[in-house]
Amino acid sequence: IKGISFDVNEGEIVTLIGANGAGKTTTLHAVSRLLKPKQGEISFCGQPISSMEAHKIIQLGLTQVPEGRRVFSQLTVQQNLALGAYTRKDGADAVAADYEMVFQRLPRLKERRRQIAGTLSGGEQQMLAIGRALMCKPKMLLLDEPSMGLSPLLVQEIFSIIHDVNQSGVT
């Protein structure tokens, strides 16, 4: 990818649109530091992050939900959510409150919290991937093809969840 430049303001919902192979996923991977840019600068909340380690970027509040409903399929829903809180240092009470927040936004996950993630439906796995990202306490949530492979009804539900998350202050 060459010559890309964009700003995302706090509270916005921004969409990258382009053909297959245009570089949308590569751009998200560079922003979240899964790929290292060869040149240029990426900043988040006024801080340069181009050479920052991925876990430190997460601690700053930038979290990505990868394409393809990536969950830890052999772990339970609860264990997947716990991994989202792994880098947090704000204490067990804050993490417990965020479990409840995720379960309130995504009630199916509460019903299935002891279920193995690989046995969930595609829509439930996508909800789990979003829930795991929310456990990181993001300021900005990067979603790579959040509706990929979902039925139209589930697409509407996922987009409603994204809207609710945005309304709560997450960019």
Cite the ranges covered by each PLM segment.
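Helix-to-loop junction immediately C-terminal to a conserved catalytic motif
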Residues: 32
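Conserved ABC transporter NBD signature motif
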Residues: 40-47, 60, 94-99
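A short, proline-enriched helix->beta-strand linker immediately N-terminal to the Walker B motif
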Residues: 135-139
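ABC ATPase signature
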Residues: 75, 120, 133-134
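Conserved ABC ATPase signature
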Residues: 116-120, 124
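ABC-type ATPase nucleotide-binding domains, specifically the catalytic core motifs of the NBD
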Residues: 14, 52, 77-97, 104-110
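Catalytic Walker B motif of ABC-type/P-loop ATPase nucleotide-binding domains
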Residues: 141-145
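The feature captures the beta-strand-to-loop junction immediately N-terminal to the Walker
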Residues: 17-19
